């Protein structure tokens, strides 16, 4: 039952950002279930697909005002789970464990990240690290409207504007991704409220597809990054590919 509950919660995130729920469900299952990675991967995919099917049945019976484009995002999110399971399986065990711990740490300790670990001045702008919180929210909302992963945008912003260290930028990028998920949910509610046509959705998807790809490549070309940065960059590029599929569908 806990897997189905977690799958339902993660399916909501998958609907909001057109990304499969495995990236969020996997560290949660790893924390509560003493199972091997292959079993956790299978449970993650099964729970997310079950939650997607249940959500689809609810949408077809129309108790909620969900349009066809939202059902498309839900289906892409479910398929993204299958791809995400293979994507994480391609990583080394250390990288996968590092990614899972970073995601779980971000979900459970977001205030601590900003108010203690990042509480020092920023150069060359000489702004206190407290200013990174509204900056992260703004970056997350911009990334939501552009419909691409917030990780590459945050890596560039913290690198070029704040002169932050790579580990610091990667941690902030994972935190901003949560802001992007919330922002995408807000965008979805705005679209439902204003009854925006599909053309407006593509208007936000296509620029995000191009900018997300460019932003994800620049940090890797600019400097050599550590294992954490490589994992975050790979996750952001995977998000961009999923959004490209959503734009072309």
List PLM regions with ranges.
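Juxtamembrane transmembrane-helix boundary motif
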Residues: 1-20, 24-38, 57-146, 153-160, ...
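Membrane-interface alpha-helices at helix entry/exit sites of multi-pass transporters
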Residues: 35-44, 67-72, 163-175
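Transmembrane alpha-helices of multi-pass small-molecule transport proteins
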Residues: 43-58
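Short hydrophobic/aromatic, small-residue-rich stretches within specific transmembrane helices
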Residues: 44-48, 173-177, 201-206
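Hydrophobic transmembrane alpha-helical segments of multi-pass transport and channel proteins
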Residues: 53, 178-182, 210, 214
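A general structural signal for well-ordered alpha-helical packing
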Residues: 154-158, 166, 175, 179
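Hydrophobic alpha-helical transmembrane segments of multi-pass integral membrane proteins
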Residues: 169-187
């Amino acid at each position: 039952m806990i897997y189905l509950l977690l799958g339902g919660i993660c399916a909501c995130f998958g609907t909001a950002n057109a990304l499969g729920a495995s990236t969020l469900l996997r560290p949660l299952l790893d924390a509560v279930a003493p199972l091997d990675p292959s079993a956790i991967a299978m449970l993650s995919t099964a729970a997310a697909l079950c939650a997607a099917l249940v959500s689809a049945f609810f949408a077809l019976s129309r108790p909620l005002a969900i349009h066809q484009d939202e059902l498309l995002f839900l289906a892409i999110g479910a398929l993204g789970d299958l791809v995400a399971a293979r994507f994480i399986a391609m990583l080394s065990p250390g990288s996968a464990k590092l990614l899972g711990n970073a995601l779980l740490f971000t979900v459970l300790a977001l205030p601590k990240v900003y108010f203690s670990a990042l509480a020092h001045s920023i150069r060359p702008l000489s702004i206190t690290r407290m200013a990174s919180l509204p900056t992260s929210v703004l970056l997350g909302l911009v990334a939501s409207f552009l419909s691409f992963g917030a990780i590459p945008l945050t890596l560039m912003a913290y690198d070029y504007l704040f002169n932050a260290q790579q580990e610091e930028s990667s941690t902030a990028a994972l935190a901003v991704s949560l802001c992007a998920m919330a922002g995408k949910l807000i965008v979805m509610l705005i679209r439902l409220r204003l009854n925006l046509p599909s053309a407006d959705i593509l208007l936000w998807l296509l620029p995000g597809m191009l900018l997300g790809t460019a932003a994800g490549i620049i940090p890797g070309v600019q400097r050599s990054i550590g294992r954490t940065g490589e994992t975050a960059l790979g996750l952001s590029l995977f998000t961009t590919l999923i959004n490209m599929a959503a734009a072309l569908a």
